[in-house]
Amino acid sequence: MKTNPNITEPRWLQWLLIGIALAFLLLMLVIPLMAVFYEALREGWQTYLESLTNPEARAAIRLTLIAAAIVVPINAVLGIAMAWLLTRFDFRGKQLFTTLLDLPFSVSPVVAGLMFVMLFGAHTALGGWLEARGVQIIFAIPGIILATLFVTFPFVARELIPLMQAQGESEEQAALILGANGWQMFWRITLPNIKWALLYGLILTNARAMGEFGAVSVVSGHIRGETNTIPHLVEIRFTAAFALSSLLAVLAIATLVLQDILTRIQNRKLAAAARSKQ
């Protein structure tokens, strides 16, 4: 094990901390995850596949993927816009915008779902007006999209803001002075500089969107085969719960692997850039 020569703590303390960390990871993450896969596969692969391919499960998987596919691109646009606004402009009320950005982190997802019900429910003025025109939000896919969008909104912006603040505006200003317009500056200067942070934000957004339960549970109505996502089907279908849970676990692990790959690629490029400057 490599140690920092500047650290003076005794070796036994390092091993103690490593042991505590490993014990925590085993008890809280590895063992429960292994238990999920064990229960999912205990009846054999045929039962496992049947649990994932029955019509209700397919509908839940499809809805989960649709929600993520819609929410992630929208969050990419909104996150970039919010990060640009908060890092490139000074205006009255900027601190309020920054505070509101973190609202989905502090508000319970159940409360967030209830907010949408109170706003778009059939017995509200706006919800009644929309339903009279054939647009149903609550207990339908649009409500699921809105609730998921709310709880995932901060992830992209919060990844971009620190990076954009650290990078400053010098390169963008130079591009404008040299005659680039706003779009050229964004595509050739800003986006390449923030692409890794943007990818991290999108990965986190996708993971949260696929696993969201509380807010979506309130607005979905649990209509079987129509508005149930994978987490909700895990709750109401005990026989298929472990199979569906294992699917969510696989998606989560794939997300972590992708994030690790992107981190390694970024570190290699940063190291190569540092060597080229020497």
PLM features: what roles do these ranges have?
Residues 20, 73, 99, 103, ...:
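Transmembrane alpha-helices
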Residues 10-13, 50-55, 210-265:
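Interhelical loop and adjacent transmembrane-helix boundary motif
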Residues 30-34, 38, 77-82, 111-114, ...:
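Membrane-embedded alpha-helices of multi-pass transport/permease systems
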Residues 3-10, 36-73, 88-89, 236-239:
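Periplasmic/extracellular loop-to-transmembrane helix junction in inner-membrane transport proteins
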Residues 3-7, 45-53, 58, 93-94, ...:
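Membrane-interfacial helix termini and adjacent extracytoplasmic/periplasmic loops
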Residues 27, 62, 66-78, 82, ...:
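Hydrophobic alpha-helical transmembrane segments of multipass integral membrane proteins
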Residues 2-9, 70-102, 114-118, 128-129, ...:
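Transmembrane-helix boundary motif in ABC transporter permease subunits
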Residues 9, 16-20, 31, 93, ...:
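C-terminal transmembrane helix and the adjacent membrane-cytosol boundary/short C-terminal tail
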